[in-house]
Amino acid sequence: MILTRRTLLASTAALIAAPAFADAPGEVAPTIRRLSPKLDHIIPPNAKVEVIAQNIKWAEGPVWVKDGGFLLFSDPPANIMRRWSAKDGVSIFMTPSGTAGLDPKLVREAGSNGLAMDHHGRLLIANSGGGSIDRVDLKTRQRTTLVSKYDGKRLSSCNDMAVAKSGAIYFTDPPYGFAQGDASPLKEAKQNGVYRFVEGQPLQLVDGSLTRPNGIALSPDDKRLFVSNSDEKDRKLVYYDLGSDGMPTGPAKLFLDASTLKGPGNPDGMKIAADGTMFCSSPGGMWILTPAGEKLGLIEDGAPIANCCFGEDGRTLFLTSNTRVLRLRLGIDGWAA
């Protein structure tokens, strides 16, 4: 989540539950800008972007729950997690989604942010308000805090996650949940960190040098970790080559310089398809990149697109876009077979 986007948040409103929506007056219809013919096998030429939910305060962190066939997504400032399915439309799934009872003068995003699934079908929550990574058993709704401190100091406002094949959880911890950011009296950690968590082991700091680590994703072979930096003064996407221990073998390397990109938003969430195609939130919308960083196209919605995930049969891309959620059919597999 990016603080400079707050001017784009709509006022709190009830979410309209319906499978699709016409664009509200003044809203821009989502479009696909094609920059290369290579995009056609990724997003078919006749593909259309649907609006499946709207009137959200700030849509974030989508994840598809295979066992149940539904989408979950966060609304961090509203402290709500919502559910969507083609059959039932939109409903409230969890409230509070993060931590209740926090002082709004100190915490501006008390709810969940990034969501993921572990390899046992349990929901993982980047708890922005609680400064923790939580796990929820979807059958019992039992919630467990997995990690909330590094080196004895509380984490800030956990933002996004990527789960490795080994089960390790990589996550980012910027100060976006705090009303005063780095200057917050609640902030204990010196760094805005990228971390690696393995249950039963000490939390590992992957990198503490990024000013605003945000979106995070692993390559299909788990050999590279990608992280977006959302600082308006240093907008970029970097990557780390990972060793057999799951930690970087060297410093971060630049993958995408986003400082020259135009349009709403900053570098944010991302997902990587089974063939290595990258869907990366950056200024302008959701960019589609090759594994080498070539720009193939851009999904635009007239507002920042915070994050995305694959869902349904693995060939649907869901996008959380400011006050609404979008759906787009793909021509490639998001998940490995």
Placement of each model-derived feature along the sequence:
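Sequence-structural signature of mature extracellular/luminal beta-sheet repeat domains
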Residues: D23-A337
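N-terminal export signals
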Residues: T7-A24
